[in-house]
UniProtKB/Swiss-Prot annotation:
The modification N4-methylasparagine is found at residue 71. The keyword ATP-binding does not apply. This is Allophycocyanin beta chain. Light-harvesting photosynthetic bile pigment-protein from the phycobiliprotein complex. Allophycocyanin has a maximum absorption at approximately 650 nanometers. (2R,3E)-phycocyanobilin binds at residue 81. PANTHER family: ALLOPHYCOCYANIN BETA CHAIN, PHYCOBILISOME 32.1 KDA LINKER POLYPEPTIDE, PHYCOCYANIN-ASSOCIATED, ROD 2-RELATED. It comes from Cyanophora paradoxa.
């Protein structure tokens, strides 16, 4: 896992150069949004259960997926879906704090789509739930932090799609 600072420094180091204007601007932007990201992470942490509950209600609860024969039918499958959605919200929050998607590649997306496909987990419904979590989160943290978090929710969704 890296953060925005490490990514900028590593890119310059690989080229054997000092930071250029664009690199300095990336760092400046990262530091300027630091307080916003920390406040958003605190709000998400304090409301994670409510985010998951509302996202499930918006996206999955009343669809065919929860009826007998659906992929979320039985308590065990339903619990696994809730667990996975919580995992996505948590790791999207980590990525937002770091200002970098590498943790999502390393700890969430690497092999996940293949695993879901082999287990018969409906990827479309998973993406729908992630997008619902994005919407719920934005409502809690406000438009600026919501847009920032949206980057990481969308990254997960794209990686699964």
């Amino acid at each position: 896992m890296q953060d925005a600072i490490t990514a900028v420094i590593n890119a310059a180091d690989v080229q054997g150069k000092y930071l250029d204007t664009a690199s300095v601007e990336k760092l400046k932007s990262y530091f300027q949004t630091g307080e916003l990201r920390v406040r958003a992470a605190a709000t998400i942490a304090a409301n994670s259960s409510a985010i998951i509950k509302e996202a499930v209600a918006k996206s999955l609860l009343y669809s065919d997926i929860t009826r007998p024969g659906g992929n979320m039918y039985t308590t065990r499958r339903y619990a696994a879906c809730i667990r996975d959605l919580d995992y996505y919200v948590r790791y999207a929050t980590y990525a937002m704090l770091a200002g970098d998607t590498s943790i999502l590649d390393e700890r969430v997306l690497n092999g996940l789509k293949e695993t879901y496909n082999s287990l018969g987990v409906p990827v479309g419904a998973t993406i729908q739930a992630i997008q619902a979590a994005k919407e719920v989160t934005a409502g809690l943290v406000g438009p600026d932090a919501g847009r920032e978090m949206g980057i990481y929710y969308d990254y997960i969704s794209s990686g699964l799609g």
